[in-house]
UniProtKB/Swiss-Prot annotation:
The family this protein is said to belong to: Belongs to the FBPase class 1 family.
GO biological process, any: fructose 6-phosphate metabolic process
GO cellular component labels: cytosol
Pfam families from the UniProt entry: FBPase, FBPase_C
Protein name: Fructose-1,6-bisphosphatase class 1
GO function term, MF aspect, one: magnesium ion binding
Co-factor binding details: Binds 2 magnesium ions per subunit.
Gene designation: fbp
Subunit structure and binding partners: Homotetramer.
Keywords: Carbohydrate metabolism, Cytoplasm, Hydrolase, Magnesium, Metal-binding
Length: 335
């Protein structure tokens, strides 16, 4: 099938009517700027060692993590790419301590993880960009960090772009999930799948099994039952997957079902989890819920959590609804 038979991203935004209304022009402008930047970033990622982009940058981010060269490049590209958006009041990045004013006033706030899974860059495993867009509560007021501290229910759009064998984007505007693939000749994202859904049941889970001894009892119980297979309490065999790149693992869940888990563990008991609520958990939870799945920290739905810090961390379990319901039940019954 030729690319001319596919709807491109701009055409999709012009035609789509989430909640029965056309996407606001300012939101369209911002989403187009983000995707155009991701198209550029896809090219940079693909060049890798050929243009000297692999390896550590020798610096650390606000999270205390070693930055890869591409982390910094991706962050800079995204900031530069959205600077001209008149409706964008400000942005926040996983790589930076404080928000950055863009227009100062405006309707929207952008949050992003510029390059999720960047520890996999040098081994050529899929990585990606995750983004979330919020409506600024008072568009005319000067930008403050507190403007970003809204629950996931306030998101008006969220998505990710995964840089793999194809560069593919998943997007929700709050009315289901659609997917696009980048035509690397034209630089356009083309619609490949609408009405993406996650099956309610599954036989596949993703978790880092090497940390099993550190997990809380409800997660241990769930995984042990999966491992017991057809002869155990679940009476069916499960497969385990783990890419160690959230964007790639969640893309698999959206594409064919399953459960992704990055739970709290006892190695850092004072931290509620590893993943970032605002840059990773909220946008991925929005996508998963819109595809018919669910997302929890064990006791609460991720999207209902009220953030108190821009870089807040959280335990994450998301995917097929029956499995997430089971995990929540185990957490409540073993509490």
């Amino acid at each position: 099938m030729s690319s001319s038979t596919h709807t491109n991203f701009k055409q999709y935004l012009a035609a789509v009517k989430p909640q029965g209304e056309a996407a606001p022009a300012g939101l369209q402008e911002l989403l187009i700027a983000v995707t155009q930047t991701c198209s550029t970033l896809s090219h940079e990622v693909a060049q890798g060692a050929l243009i000297g982009l692999l390896g550590s940058a020798g610096t650390g981010n606000v999270q205390g993590e070693v930055q890869q060269k591409l982390d910094i490049i991706a962050n800079d590209l995204l900031i530069e790419g959205v600077q001209g958006c008149k409706s964008l009041a400000g942005l926040a990045s996983e790589e930076m301590e404080l928000p950055v004013p863009v227009q100062g006033t405006g309707d929207y706030l952008l949050l992003f993880d510029p390059l999720d899974g960047s520890s996999n860059i040098d081994v050529n495993v899929s990585i990606g960009t995750i983004f979330s867009i919020l409506k600024k509560q008072d568009p005319q007021a000067p930008l403050q960090t507190a403007d970003f501290l809204l629950s996931g229910r306030h998101q008006v759009a969220a998505g990710y772009v995964v840089y793999g064998p194809q560069t593919t984007m998943a997007l929700t505007l709050g009315d289901g999930v659609v997917m696009f693939t980048l035509n690397k000749v034209t630089g356009e994202f083309l619609l490949i799948k609408d009405a993406v859904t996650i099956a309610h049941s599954t036989k596949e889970f993703a978790i880092n099994m090497s940390n099993m001894r550190h997990w809380a009892d409800p997660v241990k119980r769930y995984v042990e039952e999966c491992l017991a297979g057809v002869g155990g309490a679940r009476e069916k065999d499960f497969n385990m997957r783990w890419i160690a790149s959230m964007v790639a693992d969640v893309h698999r869940v959206l594409s064919r079902g399953g459960v992704f888990m990055y739970p709290w563990d006892q190695r850092e008991p004072h931290k509620p989890g590893k993943l970032r609520l605002m840059y990773e958990a909220n946008p991925m939870s929005f996508l998963v819920e819109q595809a018919g799945g669910a997302s929890t920290n064990g006791t609460q739905l991720i999207m209902d959590l009220q953030p108190t810090d821009l870089h807040e961390r959280v335990s994450v379990m998301l995917g097929s609804k029956e499995e997430i319901d089971r995990l929540q039940h185990y957490h409540s019954s073993l509490a």
